[in-house]
Amino acid sequence: SHFEIERHGITALIGPNGAGKTTFFNLMTGFDTPNTGTWQFDGKDMAHVQPEKVARMGMVRTFQLTKVMSRLTVLDNMLLGAPVQPGEGMFRALFPGMWRKQEQANIEKAEALLERFLLIKKKDDYAGALSGGQRKLLEMARALMPDPKLVMLDEPMAGVNPALKQSLLDHIMALREEGTTVLFVEHDINMVRHIADWVTVMAEGKIVAEGQPKSVMNDPAVIDAYLGAHANVDLGDDSVLEDL
């Protein structure tokens, strides 16, 4: 009934399919409307706040199925995430001097992030031509355009090859080093145990356990909820996790 995210750390949200993890993300970011309950971000009430305003307030998210604009270039996809777009209005668009400097700053920031995520050579390609893993990188890079305080990643490792998975892991840990708070959903318990500072476990729409990774992985309620038929195994044993 109560969920908090520690600042400047990596919190993992885990649980079996259907536990409510993505629904929780949707509620927190304004994509769905809850029937009851309250929630705050950075001391501000977030009830009835629209998704685009949530992002401007510093809470951004990615999706299980990447949301890239296939018919826009990679660079244009990045620019969609820029928080300041003074040339969008009809009147201002007629006067380039009012927005050209900011637009150039947005482009420079986007290119710097594409360089960081090893996508700079793709900046002029259509986003639809990217591989699934590259789209994951693009979505994470775009999420950083508004300098968020909290980044919410919904299964960032799903469907990517081992090399890209390691790249994504490095980027997530780099965010923590930079002081950005990270909340991510993941099914790879072994990976969660190695990079998360705090773990929250959901099952059937409820929080069943939370704490540091080692203690959570040994919680009988977690083992029962998350592994079912494998409830007798030790989640702290790497060899067992590899077999699963």
Where do the PLM segments sit?
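Conserved ABC nucleotide-binding domain
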Residues: 47-48, 113-131
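Conserved ABC transporter NBD signature motif
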Residues: 37-44, 56-57
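Helix-to-loop junction immediately C-terminal to a conserved catalytic motif
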Residues: 29
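The feature captures the beta-strand-to-loop junction immediately N-terminal to the Walker
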Residues: 14-16
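Conserved ABC ATPase "signature" region
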Residues: 90-122, 152, 170-173
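A short, surface-exposed alpha-helical micro-motif characterized by mixed small hydrophobic
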Residues: 192-194
